[in-house]
């Protein structure tokens, strides 16, 4: 778990070195409080699940239905203003990042959203998520974060 923690801290450090764009730039620098960092093992099958719909049709109205927690699928397909991606795009991206023949070699952790102001935007409305994925076969980390507002 310590290597995952270091990878998450490094990912946030990299975000701080980049030019930020977006509609909410209230934090010019993302901070990390390591003492508040918590994680839990995340099931591989659940991580790659591609079937949870986040919309419910109620008469002529499309209503957002938030899952009990943000899933990777939700983060990819349901940002505040939508994306033009297909399920096929989701599968292609995952095949590039995590070739299916090696998925059993993945170690996935889901992180809490109380240790960094990176999550403040998402806490306002859309939601937050952060996963650290270690690919034992390729000896690399992939960090996926989500935190947006309108």
Task: Explain the meaning of each model-derived region.
Residues 87-150:
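Acidic, proline/glycine-rich low-complexity IDRs
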Residues 1-103:
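Extended, low-hydrophobicity segments enriched in charged/polar residues
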């Amino acid at each position: 778990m310590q290597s995952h923690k270091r990878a998450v801290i490094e990912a946030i450090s990299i975000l701080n070195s980049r030019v930020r764009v977006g509609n909410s730039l209230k934090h010019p620098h993302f901070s990390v409080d390591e003492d508040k960092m918590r994680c839990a093992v995340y099931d591989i099958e659940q991580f790659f699940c591609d079937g949870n719909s986040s919309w419910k049709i109620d008469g002529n109205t499309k209503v957002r239905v938030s899952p009990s927690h943000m899933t990777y699928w939700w983060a990819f397909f349901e940002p505040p203003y939508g994306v033009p991606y297909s399920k096929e795009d989701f599968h292609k991206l995952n095949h590039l990042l995590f070739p299916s023949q090696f998925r059993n070699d993945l170690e996935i952790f889901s992180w809490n959203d109380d240790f960094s102001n990176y999550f403040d935007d998402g806490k306002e409305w859309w939601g937050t998520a952060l996963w650290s994925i270690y690919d034992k076969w390729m000896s690399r980390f992939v960090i996926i974060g989500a935190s947006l507002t309108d």
